[in-house]
Design a protein with these regions (language model features):
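Cytosolic, long alpha-helical scaffolding segments
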Residues: 8-180
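Short, Lys/Arg-enriched N-terminal segments with co-localized hydrophobic residues
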Residues: 1-7
Length: 180
């Protein structure tokens, strides 16, 4: 009987030290999926010709941004709760913060389009929206690839693709600046 209590105590202690990697991966995947939804809505809004419909689409991103804030908060809570993590604690914190920044930037861009009453959406802005969407789809692939680190090739390809979209975005920014 005494050995059962020792075993149960040991099992309880071990739960504290065992990694909760499924928790972190699931939360990162949730944030990434939310970002994909946000980029789809943003791209659709930028392509929308009707200003009222565009405004409604852009306004809907606020709710998505708040959802991402909640999930990011859960990641930070889990980070504080778990002694062992699937990868470096600082990397988890940095990734969570960076993903949250993307949601913040999408919502910020949406607010500026609404607040400044931008109705004439040019080709450069539409190109940017498409680049953002492609980048987030590649990011989504990379985030889902974290769970299975055995497929490093696919993860690396997604990261290279994200970098190429960043370069495409830089070129599009230069193009937009020339039109000012």
């Amino acid at each position: 009987n005494y050995s059962i209590h020792i075993y149960m105590a040991f099992a309880s202690i071990m739960k504290i030290f065992l990694p909760k990697d499924r928790v972190f991966y699931g939360l990162f995947e949730e944030v990434s999926s939310n970002l994909a939804q946000m980029s789809d809505i943003f791209t659709k809004a930028i392509a929308e010709k009707d200003s009222t419909a565009r405004h409604n689409l852009l306004k809907s991103l606020e709710e998505w941004e708040h959802k991402n804030d909640e999930v990011t908060h859960k990641i930070f809570i889990e980070l504080g709760r778990n002694f062992i993590t699937p990868f470096d604690r600082e990397d988890i914190h940095y990734l969570a913060t960076s993903l949250d920044d993307i949601a913040d930037y999408l919502w910020g861009a949406s607010k500026r389009v609404m607040n400044y009453g931008i109705d004439d959406i040019d080709d450069v802005t539409q190109d940017f929206a498409n680049i953002i969407s492609k980048s987030i789809k590649a990011l989504n692939k990379a985030i889902y690839g974290l769970r299975d680190m055995k497929d490093i090739r696919s993860l690396t390809e997604a990261c290279v693709l994200i970098n190429s979209y960043e370069n495409e975005g830089d070129d599009t920014l230069d193009k937009g600046m020339m039109h000012l």
